[in-house]
Design a protein with these regions (language model features):
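Multi-pass alpha-helical transmembrane bundle typical of ion/small-solute transporters
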Residues: 1-275
Length: 275
């Protein structure tokens, strides 16, 4: 809701329709291509493009970037999105250095315990991912309900929470093999690498969920793997794969914004759908 200052009235519904349509189509396309892009970036880009097409720049709450911890509006969202991968990289790099030093005299039997820790860290990461993603889903649903006059926005109904949780859970279950292989191909990992990347990713995602900072879990995981790989052997990192992923991250917001703008102009301005 920080992105737009559009009043909660019916003419917001076409804006949301074009915004979400653009984001969904982009996500389906990149998923088919096996590119691990960010659904959060797509949603932000879609809302920006839809709002600009529907009402103009004056309805964008740009906010202020003066102080990171006091940033507001679009700047707050963008700072969270683009700083979180750097946090993942640094956490992966520093934690690997620390644990590699700590475990240097430990035998390979420690791998069994590191693998066992995955049973704790993976659920932590999944919980943080779900908590972060469902907040965005609920925000969009509540915007639509308020615009349609079906809610005052004072409290999020249980059915909205339930639908959002089920949607995110079903999305996690529908694994995209190409994306899994792409992220896994950044660096050849052993138990210590997996432990560090999961620990750093879970910590950052949980912190962002608690503080209300939107981020992309896939970004954080991928950047933490790059950090872990760089800490051990920088030449072992498949930088071409990492570069392709980063390009997709930076391309998503402007590409989806333009797509949402075009959709809105075509469907709601020229064809007058739902108006």
């Amino acid at each position: 809701r920080d992105i737009t200052s559009w009043p909660a009235r019916p003419d917001l519904l076409p804006v949301l329709a074009s915004s979400l349509s653009a984001a969904i189509i982009w996500n389906i396309f990149t998923r088919r291509m096996g590119v691990p892009t960010s659904s959060t970036h797509a949603l932000v880009g879609g809302i920006l493009g839809g709002v600009i097409a529907g009402g103009g720049m004056q309805y964008i709450s740009w906010g202020s970037p003066k102080m990171i911890y006091k940033a507001s509006g679009v700047w707050r969202v963008l700072l969270s999105l683009f700083l979180s991968p750097f946090a993942g990289f640094l956490a992966g790099l520093l934690l690997f250095k620390f644990f590699a030093f700590l475990l240097q005299s430990v035998s390979t039997r420690a791998n069994k315990y590191l693998n066992g820790m995955e049973w704790v860290l993976v659920p932590m990461l999944a919980f943080g991912h779900g908590a972060n993603e469902t907040q965005k889903a609920m925000g969009v649903i509540m915007l639509a309900l308020c615009a349609a006059g079906l809610s005052q926005g004072a409290e999020i109904p249980l059915w909205v929470r339930t639908i959002s949780a089920l949607a995110v859970a079903s999305g996690i279950l529908s694994v995209a093999p190409l994306i899994v292989r792409r992220v896994g191909g950044i660096y050849k990992q052993r138990p210590l690498h997996g432990f560090i990347s999961q620990l750093s990713s879970a910590s950052i995602v949980l912190f962002a969920s608690i503080t209300g900072g939107p981020l992309s879990t896939s970004q954080v995981v991928a950047s933490s793997i790059v950090g872990v790989g760089s800490a051990e052997r920088i030449k072992g990192v498949h930088w071409q794969v990492a570069r392709d992923i980063v390009r997709a991250w930076f391309l998503t917001i402007p590409a989806v914004a333009v797509f949402a703008w075009l959709l809105h102009m075509l469907l709601f301005r020229h064809l007058n759908l739902f108006l």
